[in-house]
């Protein structure tokens, strides 16, 4: 997909399935605005929207390109993230594993969209830099 452009990926609260996210996020304004609705009102950025921006947005959904994945990926997620549920990171990790792509999933059960507890933030940063050190050429 990226034709060896990147040595590795790191996704914090990453989105794997845009359509599923549309139905599961706690903040619908973001779902409509970010998905191509551009302030036209609720449902304007929905998966069934006919606005060209929304159609283009969903055409680039990561889940549609799993068969092209070959870059190692580290996925971080907060277990209490209601903006982007942790199952998005789990889905990306599971697909990477099924594709034989080196991958790691780190879920902080007591954290939300941000990793705020000091011990967790320290672990996040250590894991982040360890991943880069491992895969950067």
Where are the regions that the model predicts?
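Active-site-proximal cap/loop segments of hydrolase catalytic domains
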Residues: 1-137
């Amino acid at each position: 997909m990226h034709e060896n452009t990147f040595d590795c990926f790191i996704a914090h609260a990453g989105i794997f399935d845009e359509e599923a996210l549309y139905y599961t996020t706690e903040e619908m304004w973001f779902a409509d605005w970010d998905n191509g609705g551009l302030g036209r009102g609720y449902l304007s950025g929905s998966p069934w929207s006919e606005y060209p921006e929304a159609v283009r947005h969903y055409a680039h959904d990561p889940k549609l390109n799993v068969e092209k994945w070959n870059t190692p990926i580290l996925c971080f997620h907060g277990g209490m993230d209601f903006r982007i549920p942790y199952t998005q990171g789990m889905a990306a990790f599971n697909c990477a594993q099924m594709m034989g792509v080196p991958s790691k999933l780190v879920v902080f059960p007591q954290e939300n969209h941000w990793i705020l507890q000091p011990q967790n933030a320290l672990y996040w940063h250590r894991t982040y830099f360890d991943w880069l050190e491992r895969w950067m050429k």
